[in-house]
A protein has these predicted regions:
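An N-cap/entry alpha-helix motif that binds or orients negatively charged groups
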Residues: 35-112, 210, 217-250, 386-388, ...
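N-terminal secretory signal peptides
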Residues: 1-12
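Short beta-strand segments
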Residues: 122-123, 173-175, 199-203, 347
Length: 398
């Protein structure tokens, strides 16, 4: 079995196959005419970035292949990854022809504190692979854009260093462990460093066998995340057919155990069903975080956007709902808000900005999304975030 694993890991991935096919075409006689720009290479400047999508080609050009693939890909066949983006096409914006949009405000109050925008930076791991200063650089860029950042439990730097890098608002994301003391130690360190909220991830009960084999090449070249605690031996090497014990651990009683130690809001991240949303509230969560992990956990899961309305109905206004997965534009943000989210988080887009241009790139991406949100609000006749409701959209989910 170990030999089969090694052979499988060495085989071409989907993206490698595409690259090989492109190389074959390039060598074809059909493409034998000399390219006058063959040796010309130019990376666009930051001031040329108009949409978030503009950052991805620059990111692709700058990063090693393994690092880019780790960030870009989804679980297994990537159905969920594709569905996340497709779901925004199932929601139309309803224009409002006559409306006074001369003054538009995007500030929102969340858990008693006011944010200038409903857009936050989602937790994402190992940003040191994208930029030498990793999460510290991300915090600088997010702070410059007046945007709250959620720091991943699997960050490349300690929470103390990340918090000291800038003065913006921070939350902390926790991957639960079986060792309760380890969970409590991590939460204490995060709150002592200045994190005012905690997001507990509940949607990584196992790791894709295919993805795990591909990602070992990346992980082997990076430092172990300093906030993650002790890492057990990877059980997938020895038991490829079972759930990896010792990695993540989820029981609802965990929320009961840690609630009293968290001074600010506590949210459960990775909720995709109304029943789980109700259980979040029953076990002391102050908010529900709707997410499918950006299509990186369960293949053939529903998109976050299509399940959002049902979860909103189940929650019935008792707690705020945070949303992520698939957001690339300001109109995407408005669609999620219209379907019931109080705020949204973006993951890949600020990572593109970080990899391409460092902190200024992060700031620019977030400012682009903010400008696009204001534009979409103007066209739909909404002058404040509170004015955005389901009448701003028309849905056609399959």
């Amino acid at each position: 079995m170990r030999i089969l694993e090694q052979a499988w890991a060495a085989s071409l991935s989907r993206r490698n196959a595409v690259r090989a096919f492109a190389a074959l075409l390039t060598g074809s006689p059909l493409h034998s005419q000399q390219d006058p720009f063959r040796d010309h290479s130019r990376v666009a400047g930051l001031d040329e970035m108009v949409t978030a999508f503009d950052f991805e080609p620059v990111t692709y050009a700058k990063l090693p292949r393994e690092v880019y693939d780790y960030m870009a890909h989804g679980a297994d066949s990537e159905f969920t990854l594709r569905r996340n983006r497709e779901s925004y096409d199932w929601v139309d914006l309803v224009p409002k022809g006559v409306a006074n949009s001369s003054t538009i405000r995007t500030d929102v109050e969340l858990f008693g504190s006011k944010m200038p925008s409903p857009i936050m930076v989602a937790p994402s791991s190992l940003q040191g692979a994208l930029h030498p200063d990793g999460e510290m650089a991300m915090h600088l860029g997010a702070s410059a854009a007046n945007t709250r950042m959620i720091v991943s439990n699997a960050a490349s730097f300690t929470i103390e260093k990340i918090a000291a890098a800038a003065k913006g608002s921070l939350w902390f994301q926790l991957y639960p462990k079986k060792d309760l003391d380890a969970n409590l130690d991590g939460l204490e360190a995060a709150q002592k460093a200045g994190c005012t909220g905690v997001v507990v991830t509940v949607d990584v009960q196992a790791v894709s066998y295919e993805r795990d084999l591909h990602d070992r090449r990346l992980a082997s070249g990076l430092l172990r995340p300093p906030n993650a605690g002790a890492r057990p031996r990877d059980p997938l090497v020895h038991n490829p057919y079972g759930a990896p014990e010792g990695r993540m651990w989820y029981e609802w009683k965990l929320f009961d155990q840690i609630r009293s130690t968290i001074k600010g809001p506590m949210l459960a991240k990775g909720i995709l069903t109304p029943e789980d949303a109700r259980l979040c509230i029953e076990h002391g969560c102050d908010g529900v975080y709707v997410s499918n992990h950006g299509g990186r956990s369960l293949d053939y899961a529903p998109s976050s956007l299509e399940v959002l309305p049902g979860i909103v109905d189940a929650v019935a206004g008792r707690v705020p709902i945070i949303f992520d997965s698939g957001i690339r534009t300001g109109s995407d943000v408005l669609k999620a808000l219209a379907l019931g989210a109080k705020a949204v988080c973006v993951g890949r887009t600020p990572r593109w900005g970080l990899a391409a241009y460092g902190p200024p790139g992060v700031q620019r991406v977030l400012e682009i999304l903010q400008a696009e949100l204001i534009q979409a609000m103007a066209y739909t006749g909404r002058t404040s975030i509170d004015a955005i409701d389901k009448t701003a959209v028309r849905t056609d989910f399959p």
